[in-house]
Regions:
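N-terminal beta1-alpha1-beta2 module of alpha/beta enzyme domains
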Residues: 1-65
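Hydrophobic faces of well-ordered beta-strands that scaffold small-molecule active sites
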Residues: 3-9, 35-37, 63-66, 93-97, ...
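Active-site mouth loops of central-metabolism enzymes
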Residues: 4-18, 68-75, 146-157, 212-215, ...
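Short, acidic/polar
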Residues: 15-27, 78-81, 156-167, 225, ...
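Conserved, mostly hydrophobic/aromatic
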Residues: 31, 54, 85, 124, ...
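Glycine-rich, proline-tolerant flexible connector loops at the mouths of alpha/beta enzymes
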Residues: 34-57, 69, 101-104, 176-180, ...
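Alpha-helix-loop-beta-strand connector modules within alpha/beta enzyme cores
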Residues: 48-68, 72, 123, 127, ...
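An alpha-helical appendage that flanks or caps ligand/catalytic pockets
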Residues: 110-142, 183-300, 331-332
Length: 332
């Protein structure tokens, strides 16, 4: 099985479009399969417009939003934007959706309730497939050419979100990390949701997501990602502790109690509370050889697409080393 490798958050910490374009072009040159941008509308350049511009300078890579929400953008606006990006990129767009995270809470707003969120996912998917939807004013659909439907993914970590994705989405961006036991648990929830909607598990693509750091010294790599995974881990455990082994539960609860979402990213938690379990679960960090061993285990478990967020501190070094020393082992 040939694995797909995508990069996430190319625009993290980047203040100008030229640098993002350089990163996008280099990702394609190195053989990555996709580039994904998160959306934080005041702290980062607009993701939809940025990806549309990246479509003009790339030929092959998937262009994904991972993720946006329905708090700031109405589902019909998202449908139109996704369909537009897919036309501009000639079928390479993926729209990743979540209920709302940092940018939403930071403005004192609330995440979209799951029932409303699922209705929105279904509406967006319905519209990008070229179908009209019924509104008080009558039937309304996308009025421009849709050569191919954009893929609609749901970012999910908790059991309800995973089942929702199985019922309603084309794919799942799996934020539960790279623990094989958790991966099997998540697939079970997705399978259950798919069954509720009369779908097959194979109908839903799964992208496993986490942090990346490749260094000559594996311990250094794990030190670098320790703070950066804190936000990811905190987001995950807000939904459930169900996936935490009993022997790790006390440490995870201490981490959650010590996390302050209102502080800057690097200062939200004492690094000593980000233990080895969290680093291992939410990152692929180490020497090239250690990364190869880890990914081989994931592939054997059925993982076929990884979305990796390179640590900002060593972004270029990690992206280059991973592409030249790790990826070739899985692209034969």
């Amino acid at each position: 099985m040939v694995l797909k490798f995508s990069l996430h958050s190319l625009h993290g910490g980047v203040k100008n479009l030229d640098e993002i374009h350089k990163r996008a072009k280099r990702a394609e040159e190195l053989g990555y399969d996709g580039i994904f941008l998160g959306e934080s509308h005041l702290s980062s350049i607009d993701s939809f417009q940025t990806l549309a511009s990246c479509a003009m300078i790339t030929q092959r890579v998937l262009l994904g939003i991972a993720v946006t929400n329905m708090v700031f953008r109405h589902p019909t606006v998202l449908a139109g934007a996704a369909a537009s990006l897919n036309e501009i990129s000639k079928g390479r767009a993926i729209l990743g959706l979540g209920t709302g995270d940092g940018p939403v809470y930071g403005q004192g707003l609330k995440a979209t309730p799951l029932k409303e969120f699922e209705e929105g996912v279904k509406l967006i998917r319905h519209l990008v497939q070229g179908n009209p939807a019924t509104f008080p004013s009558g039937n309304v659909g996308i009025g421009f050419t849709i050569s191919k439907p954009a893929a609609i993914y749901v970012s999910a970590e908790g059991p309800k979100g995973l089942q929702l994705a199985g019922r309603s989405a084309d794919g799942v961006i799996l934020g539960t990390g790279f623990d094989l036991r958790v991966y099997e648990w998540a697939r079970h929830k997705i399978r259950a949701g798919a069954g509720e909607a009369g779908r097959k598990e194979s109908d839903i693509a799964v992208i496993a997501a986490g942090m990346l750091c490749v260094r000559g010294d594996g311990n250094e790599a794990r030190r670098i990602v320790r703070n950066r995974i804190a936000n990811r881990a905190h987001h995950n455990f807000r939904f459930t502790y169900e996936t935490v082994p009993p022997e790790e539960l006390e440490g995870v609860k201490k981490f959650m109690a010590g996390f302050d979402a209102m502080k800057p990213m690097e200062d939200r938690v004492d690094p000593d509370l980000v233990n080895d379990y969290l680093v291992h679960r939410f990152s692929i960090a180490g020497t090239p050889e250690e990364c190869i061993e880890r990914i081989a285990e994931l592939r054997a478990a059925g993982v076929d697409h990884l979305m990796l967020t390179a640590a900002r501190k060593v972004y270029h070094e990690s992206v280059e080393a991973f592409a030249t020393k790790v990826m070739p082992h899985f692209q034969k």
